[in-house]
Amino acid sequence: MASIYDFTVKNADGSDFSLKDYEGKVVIIVNTATGCGFTPQYEDLEKLYEKYHDKGLEILDIPCNQFAGQAPGSDEEIHSFCTLHYHTSFPQRKKSDVNGANELPLYAYLKTQQKFKGLGKGLKAKMVGMAYKSKGKVSDNPDDIHWNFTKFLVDRQGNVVARYEPTQSMKDFEEAVKTLMEAK
């Protein structure tokens, strides 16, 4: 059976990054965009990184332009935007697809480990659902990523333990991260 440690992704400079480097760490895997209504979640992610990085938290940031073209810049421009506006200190990887024919193999795996369970209730969830159907859907896989800032949470043993949609509470997500960080 595969684990996240079997995968590589590209760094922004095009070199390979092996997820084996994350063995024994808690990992947040997130597809991001700079022009999205959820982009301010970078602030919450950076706070988590600052709080827990020394205790073994890593963030795998995969910029993605598949959802309404909300990450249009080059890898360098995206990195500059994030460091300037959100003071991000965690590394960003190469902009990549998370759905469809060119999706990262890592994302194909993640979607088998944590299925899509819905966007939740409320106006944001309805808006994201409509936007996905009109501007983001690239396949008929019901477990595809539905928008930017979908987060997968991986425990220290490499198990993909949760999937959080961008419409879900960041407070609930932070509690889940805290619980994993405190687990031995």
What are these regions (language model features)?
Residues 1-20, 38:
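N-terminal "domain-start" segment that seeds a small globular fold
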Residues 4-5, 27, 148-150:
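Short loop/turn microsegments at loop-to-beta-strand junctions
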Residues 25-26, 34-63, 82-86:
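Conserved helix-turn-beta segment immediately C-terminal to the redox Cys motif
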Residues 53-74, 89-100:
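Thiol-based oxidoreductase modules, predominantly thioredoxin-like and allied folds used
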Residues 81, 87-168:
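Thiol/selenol-based redox catalytic cores and closely related redox-interacting motifs
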Residues 161-183:
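Non-catalytic, surface beta->alpha helical segment in thiol-disulfide oxidoreductase systems
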